[in-house]
């Protein structure tokens, strides 16, 4: 509707936003733009829940996009340029799916979510990733073609850590976070030492 509507959001109330063309509301495909904390996202899938979250410094507004992990979420993940080699994109899709599954269902009150849409978990760009000029369809196709592929241990998805740079070698989880994960191993990563590929993060200091 036209105009502006003001809605008081009390501490015990959740405000849900739905739009046409989703699993939650029938109608033509619709895009919405959401601006939160100065960042604008274009969203196509799911629904949004707005809630007042208590923090040590007081209350703040949390906005959560509830989407289906298998496709709607993974289509919007932006952890790698979509023009990179297919094998790299396939590995990223499998790692992102595995990481998300390892966190799914574990509610975090600090964000009213299972997964942060930032580097705290995985960067979620939303529909903008899917409609990237020329290459957006490539990423969506990779996600679809690798559907169901995950990395597991004892039948459960591992926390599939990944990073853009490593300083030349990967690290053990116990050295980084204090708890052991036997599927993390120290291996050489020569690509991180290539000045042409990685000029900003070739040199690291261990502290």
Language-model segments: residues:
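Conserved, single-site charged/polar hotspot
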Residues: 1-207
